Amino acid sequence: MDLQPRLVHADCSVHAQHPVVLAAAVAALLMHAPSAAAQISVEVSPLRIELTAGPGSTTTQAITVANAGKDPIRVRAVATDWDLAKDGAPQFEGVAEGGPYSATSWIRVAPPEQVIEPAKEMTVRFSLAVPPGIQAGGYRTGVLFEFGPVTTNPAARGRDVMFKSRIATLIYVSIGQPAMAAEMTDLGVRNTGTQTQVVATIRNSSRRYVRTRGTLVLYDQSGRNVREVPVPDVPLLPESEREVAISLVDPDKQLTVAPGDYKVEVRIDVGLPALLVGETSLKVLK
């Protein structure tokens, strides 16, 4: 496949602004370890919490953790800062604490540690108190759950039992309605093995958190619409840049494109009066 010259622009004539309901969101991170993690089976719900709040407001939310395995597990719950990599992967290691959009100091988590028996569940609650006079914007925090085996060995407890698996519930807290400002800075094609993705790079220069929506349209040389693919619903953090990857060819998902020359048009709604629109050319070889 060959990517030809591209065009990225805003289309003011196609789409009027739709209000975007902002709240607090949660995404998940699961880390596997070879031995103990293989014996642990847990379910955390919800994995995304979206909240809208105002300065000085408070709320309490619940998260359910279920032990679907055959052995008791020990669960730790801690408030954590996090960020997104450019490809959208949640990042916890090396993230600066108390950044400009951190809400971690606003929350308290209880209980901090508990044992869950097989086929049982526990409820972890967090209380969030928004500071008075906080500036409007899209803030974030998370509750990180660490899972490990249960031991009654005092020596092992003294060494602090290794926690082998982690899942994070990501929490987005939207305060007010700051003005939205974003642009599509690039549109490219990424080939990975048998998969082909169209990748739009979006820069959010505002203080607002939004989620993307939209459509990729594939046109043949005659201008005929041969396929429409929805843009993934992914978070766009304040004052950040990220890639939005749209799968076009994926044999595992039975997505194929016949050989030929195509025009690719991507339209993304981020809550602006106009859609973000990018165009590029795609050549599919035999």
Protein language model features and the residues they cover:
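Beta-sheet-dominated interaction scaffolds and their linkers
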Residues: 39-71, 111-113, 182-199
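Short, surface-exposed loop/turn segments at beta-strand-coil junctions that are enriched for proline
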Residues: 129-135, 249-256
